[in-house]
Amino acid sequence: MIGESCKDIYHTGIVDRISSEAPVPIFKSEECFEKFGMAKNVHLNVLELNQECDIITNSDTHIRKERFIDKRFDSQVFRLDINDNCSPLDIDVLAYSNLSSYDAIIVSDYNKGFITAEVAEFISRSNDCIFVDSKKKDLSCYEGCFLKINEKEKSELTKPVDPKKLIVTSGKKGALYLENMYPAIQSEVFDVCGAGDVFIACLTTFYLHTNDIVKSIKLSNAFSSVSVRFSGNYIVNMNEVLNALQN
């Protein structure tokens, strides 16, 4: 697992009036809790699937995302991002990590500066089984890797990618692969935060066990469909998915 991590901080409370200083809401914070986000959220989801997983990441205290939630409506009032970028990963760290010895590599590239194009190219040459979730607009640095992006990210690509390696998630519709749409489980969407992390974690883990990308996509859809039922980053377990499939 390689990628940027952050600390997700959730403030829950209420908005009960508009400020007299400016036309903005006044938020009264009542509770605050933290979760790991981005690459560390992917990492935790892989571990939940009983798959061993090492991680190379930045300090999770550097990038922070603070969300302010009105508990009466379970709705986000606003989000505060602090330190929205980080220093590049040193290629020497990767060289010492013996990436070729791993069964697979997941790259969670939020395009915050940790994974430069040079670093991405190094990773791509280091293993034959690599799954990438990237917000870069030029994905040519990930040649030969499986790429998982969403519809918006696909529309912003500046260069074509190999369709045999491209999976496009489409929210409640499911995931598109080789012009086939694999549907998601119908589910009440409460919060999409972290759903992409769940998908890439499951996609990689199930592919290791099945060597079947289509079957892995279908299973990943199921897990992601469960994750959106909960607020914030959520670690999905197998029992929850089985219950969702039965219902």
Predicted regions and their residues:
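A secondary-structure boundary/capping signal
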Residues: 2-3, 150
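Short beta-strand/turn micro-motifs composed of small residues
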Residues: 3, 47, 57, 134, ...
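Conserved N-terminal subdomain of the carbohydrate kinase-like
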Residues: 7-104, 234-247
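Catalytic cores of large soluble enzymes that bind and process phosphate-bearing ligands
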Residues: 31-34, 38, 111-115, 146, ...
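Conserved phosphate-binding/catalytic region of the ribokinase-like
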Residues: 101, 118-129, 134-141, 156-247
